[in-house]
Amino acid sequence: MKYVYTSILFLLVANFCSAQDILSIFATKGPNAQQSSLELFKRYTNPLAESYSWAISMGWNHTARPHRPIGFDISIGTAAVLIPDNKLTYSVDGIDGVRIISGNPQVPTFFGSNTASSVIGVKNDDGTESIIPATRGVNLSAAPLPFFKFGLGVFKNTELMGRIFPKLEYNGMEIKMWGVGIKHNIIQWFYREKSPFDLSVFAGYTQADGLYPLEQSMVAPVTNPGNMLFTTRGGDFEAILSKTFPLVTFYISSGFAYSKNNLQLVGDYTLLYNKEESLNIPPNGVTEEYELKAWKFGGGIMLKFGLVFINGDYSYSEYHLISTGLGLTLK
């Protein structure tokens, strides 16, 4: 099982550590140039923050029907946020003192091309210009978040739920995730007899954390490149309607996602060959925050063969969202 976990982790982040020279963005001089560097960092990482802010809100439900008391299910699943083309690149337009010296004017974001070779110029406060190679992407079109999920029926058509991706380490990289939720069938308050369908409300909380080693700066090598820390936490609130047949369940949902994402660079950014200087990073470090507040709408299908079920669903909002699962259930 640990081998499976490690393989998933490798697929998720292996490209990251082989392609990104993020620190060179801050090889500039002066407070005005620092703001330009911070804006470049924001435009590069914003799709990463956005996608995982969405990913943690997905994959909770495959039916509106809660388990009976002591009924349960356990499954493995993956939530994936599809990255649109307009999130694979960004433009430096509107950033004070920044220009494209050579190469494509559309620069890769985190998920963009890993072969692009644009060169960016950033005007320093002393009138000089820093020449910086554009940070390459990881060449991925989706942001996946795998997990183990379980649910337990308690009382009055209520189900307690949880999910986890245990902490794993691979070549200095770390990733972990956990979440808790509760689902309650409200249709019982409207139908005295058995309802032809199920209607439930759900609330859940999820937190995902990652740590990625940073590449040494090619422009201005530093004492310790350190890591990029990644934390996403937030809630998911949904109404789910489903219709169950002997072998298949159809479900639709509407909900509100709220989450916060924090990206932080942590290292010793004193220049390796000049201990009197450091990268142009704010005294309190580089911290990029992103907040998501948005509605989402979706639907899916669950196929059940004895105790085994398979489900898949699609949700639409600012991104296209897909989740799948495979598990065992006992009502």
What are these model-predicted stretches?
Residues W60-R65, I74-I76, F148-V154, V180-H184, ...:
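Residues on the lipid-exposed face of transmembrane beta-strands in outer-membrane beta-barrel proteins
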Residues N157-L160, W189-R192, L247-F250, L307-G312, ...:
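Repeated loop/turn-to-beta-strand initiation elements of outer-membrane beta-barrel proteins
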Residues T78-L82, I164-L168, I186, A203-D209, ...:
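Transmembrane beta-strands of outer-membrane beta-barrel pores
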Residues H62-I70, D85, I187-L199, P246-V248:
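Short loop/turn motifs that connect adjacent beta-strands in outer-membrane beta-barrel proteins
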Residues K87-T89, F110, G121-L140, E169-I175, ...:
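Extracellular/periplasm-exposed beta-strand and loop segments of Gram-negative cell-envelope proteins
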